Amino acid sequence: MQPSFWHEKWDAQQIGFHLSAVNPLLIQFWSQLKLPANSQVFVPLCGKSLDMCFLAEQGHDVLACELNDLAVSQFYQENNLTHTVEKVGEHKRYSTEQITIYQGDIFSLQNTNSVELAKTSAFYDRAALIAWPEAMRLQYAQQLACLIPAGSVGLLVTLDYPQAELNGPPFSVSDDWMQANMGADFEIERLACEDVLSDNPRFVKKQVSSLTESVYKLTRKG
């Protein structure tokens, strides 16, 4: 996923990945992480997701990162959140009482924000890992591990389908890929795996033969 691709999607508002409500899987499974209310939760590639509002409503402090400036601006505007904006290193830091978003490249985030990141005890990834083609996905997974302190727990959602039948994003991520490429840094527990083909018209129209959605609990080793 090149930055230009992402910016073009937001400029054209071609954001089919954005949900107009909180993700039901987040509502269903978040409590299984058993986090204290005041835990800091890291949300990578957050877009303008309403899931951040849900996490804040649970009493968490949300620390997020998003490449596109329009996405971040729309999040605060559409949710009527008074916020401040300041330049911090290579990033712009948008902040309100419980939700802080660093706008910029996630791969340089630790250079800007190591102090705040060190306070993280949880993370949530609904559409970040699956946004990357396989050639770039491992680099993202390694960066996530780099940003997350040892002992942190997270909820991660994937889609798995025959990649040859449809071009991503979202890209297919299998359970085998998870175990092989993230198992060194995370303890991995799959909480659920459901057939969701009939719920996704784009995949049906493209005659994709199967589509499953999985929810994982990840615990950072170390």
From Swiss-Prot:
Q: What gene, per UniProt, encodes this protein? A: tpm
Enumerate the NCBIfam families for this protein: PRK13255.1, TMPT_Se_Te
Q: Which domain of life is it from?
A: Bacteria
Q: Please list the reactions this protein catalyses.
A: S-adenosyl-L-methionine + a thiopurine = S-adenosyl-L-homocysteine + a thiopurine S-methylether
Where's it found, cell-wise? Cytoplasm
Entry's EC annotation: 2.1.1.67
What GO cellular component is one of the record's annotations?
A: cytoplasm
Q: Which Pfam families match?
A: TPMT
Q: Which GO terms describe its biological process?
A: methylation; response to metal ion
Q: Does the keyword S-adenosyl-L-methionine apply?
A: yes
Please tell me whether the keyword Transferase is annotated for this protein: yes
Q: Which organism is it from?
A: Shewanella piezotolerans (strain WP3 / JCM 13877)
InterPro entries with a match to the protein in the record: SAM-dependent_MTases_sf, Thiopur_S-MeTfrase_Se/Te_detox, Thiopurine_S-MeTrfase, TPMT
Any idea what this protein is called? Answer: Thiopurine S-methyltransferase
Q: What class of enzyme is it?
A: transferase
Q: Which GO terms describe its molecular function?
A: thiopurine S-methyltransferase activity
Q: Which UniProt keywords apply?
A: Cytoplasm, Methyltransferase, S-adenosyl-L-methionine, Transferase
Specify which residues bind S-adenosyl-L-methionine according to the UniProt entry for this protein: W10, L45, E66, R126
Q: Which family does it belong to?
A: Belongs to the class I-like SAM-binding methyltransferase superfamily. TPMT family.
